[in-house]
């Protein structure tokens, strides 16, 4: 998790849930994620399984098992390609951004869709929802 449980369940605009089933592993957190969605948070589920939270998800990306890295690279490719990045944050607080940018340049949504066996447009929409949210934990 990238934030406190409270931040995720009470302060989020979008939640990116990757390979996790909080309703079974942490039922209270799972219930709070569902409540966050009911309050208006967007939910993106990235999981090959049809977990219960998929019913409330705005997007469910059913990745082929073992393709999480390609998915992450594809998300980064879209963030960069569509200029959905915080340039000042990158300049002030990151290192080797250009190397990462070079690494993900070939991970187009179409290539990632083929690798992960998902829809390229849904991947784009997931990236846009996540990148445009003010508060978006993973």
Regions from the PLM with identified roles:
Residues 1-138:
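Cofactor-pocket helix-loop regions in the catalytic cores of large enzyme subunits
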